[in-house]
Amino acid sequence: MAGVGIRSYACHRQTRRLLDGDVLMSPGPGNTDMPQTKSSPIAHPYPGRLITLDGIDGVGKSSQIEILAERLRSEGRNVLCVRDPGSTDLGTKLRAMLLDSDLEMHRRTEAMLFMASRCEMIESTLRSALADGVTVISDRFLLANVVYQSVGGEVDAQTLWQLGRLACGGVQPDVTLLLDLPAEISMQRVGGEADRMESRGVDYMAKVRQAFLDELPNAGGRTHVIDASGTIEEVAETIAAIELF
């Protein structure tokens, strides 16, 4: 699979240090010494698994979530797919507001609406699913909230992490898969369908991409950066090589 693969956030030496700092080795085809990060030994106290996919717009999260869910179900796992924001009545309404290109709001306002949507999703759906042993795959989670609302400087990332942990009530991802793509390619893929955040332009998206890489170590659980520039099938093969359980 030329040009497609997993790389560690550790390649970005300018990023902040790990929380709790340990680096795990996760061997795979052609990646026998591939670093894998873990910023917290316990993601949540439940038997289920929370896997999140994230990245800038246009990286192909939706396609990869569908493929991953189908593969895990074929292995006999009970899988629930959610999206953040969304997946509840309140979340769906908040999502429409947050992505409305005609609606302007302060970054703190954005941050609080995202937090409210995530809190509702956790308390109405995720917590009980994880307690029942379900594998939950989430399209975005707290990492995206921190990244998008901190870029621009109106709200600092540390404050957002603190607020986010409170809103999540002890639930954080077991595994975060960050699909990475240059901002220029992202904007080409999005095309003329840009929402309110995407419409801020390629320079903004480049800052968002770097912020994802910088903040990834703080996401909790194990984290992987995946090259999303290949075909859907190539990226899916890369994800399939990762140990998720």
Swiss-Prot record:
UniProt cross-references to SUPFAM superfamilies, sorted A to Z: P-loop containing nucleoside triphosphate hydrolases
Pfam families reported in the protein's UniProt record: Thymidylate_kin
Keyword rRNA processing attributed: no
Domain of life: Bacteria
Molecular function per GO: ATP binding; dTMP kinase activity
Any one GO biological process: dTTP biosynthetic process
Catalytic activity: dTMP + ATP = dTDP + ADP
CC annotations in GO: cytoplasm; cytosol
Keyword annotations of the record: ATP-binding, Kinase, Nucleotide biosynthesis, Nucleotide-binding, Transferase
InterPro entries named in the record: P-loop_NTPase, Thymidylate_kin-like_dom, Thymidylate_kinase
Binding annotation for ATP: 55-62
Assigned EC number: 2.7.4.9
Function: Phosphorylation of dTMP to form dTDP in both de novo and salvage pathways of dTTP synthesis.
Cited NCBIfam families: DTMP_kinase (TIGR00041)
Family the UniProt entry places it in: Belongs to the thymidylate kinase family.
Family matches, as HAMAP family: Thymidylate_kinase
UniProt xrefs under PANTHER family: THYMIDYLATE KINASE, UMP-CMP KINASE 2, MITOCHONDRIAL
Name of the protein described by the UniProt record: Thymidylate kinase
Organism: Rhodopirellula baltica (strain DSM 10527 / NCIMB 13988 / SH1)
